[in-house]
């Protein structure tokens, strides 16, 4: 991902304020509610029958935290996202058979959740930087599919 020095500062400064537990669960939950076909990858998570069940599901929250933990790792290795996400790309491609388009959807949902949590602090410039990052992460996660 090619970020300007200002964009890197914007991304890392905001990320330092992110509650990974809360934002991760909300982002994954929203993905499952807004794009219900993604629920098929989470059938073992129990009740996903309605938005309240999804958003309150402890397994969704726990996995969302795990997802954002990996995203945090990516933010520490912006110059090597493909290497950072190589194993996760392989897992999602070969074993889980996740449609790589879902990585883009989750990235965009994450941007929405960050905007919701940070309001005016999530300026258009910050959003532009985050859109670059989530696109780069989605691309890295889709790498093994090519």
UniProtKB/Swiss-Prot annotation:
Annotated positions of the S-nitrosocysteine modification: 93
Modified residue annotations for Phosphoserine: 44
Keyword entries, A-Z: Acetylation, Heme, Iron, Metal-binding, Oxygen transport, Phosphoprotein, S-nitrosylation, Transport
Tissue-by-tissue expression: Red blood cells.
Cellular component, GO annotation: blood microparticle; haptoglobin-hemoglobin complex; hemoglobin complex
Gene Ontology biological process terms, A to Z: hydrogen peroxide catabolic process
Residues the record lists as Phosphothreonine modifications: 12
Annotated binding of heme b, by residue: 63, 92
Superkingdom of this protein's organism: Eukaryota
Sites bearing N6-acetyllysine, chain numbering: 59, 82, 144
SUPFAM superfamilies according to UniProt: Globin-like (SSF46458)
InterPro entries given in the database record: Globin, Globin-like_sf, Globin/Proto, Hemoglobin_b, Hemoglobin_oxygen_transport
Residues annotated as domain Globin: 2-146
Keyword hit for Nucleotidyltransferase: no
Sequence similarity: Belongs to the globin family.
Oligomer and partners: Heterotetramer of two alpha chains and two beta chains.
PANTHER family from the UniProt entry: HEMOGLOBIN FAMILY MEMBER, HEMOGLOBIN SUBUNIT BETA
The protein, known as: Hemoglobin subunit beta
Organism: Cercocebus atys
Taxonomic lineage from the root: Eukaryota, Metazoa, Chordata, Craniata, Vertebrata
Gene name linked to the record: HBB
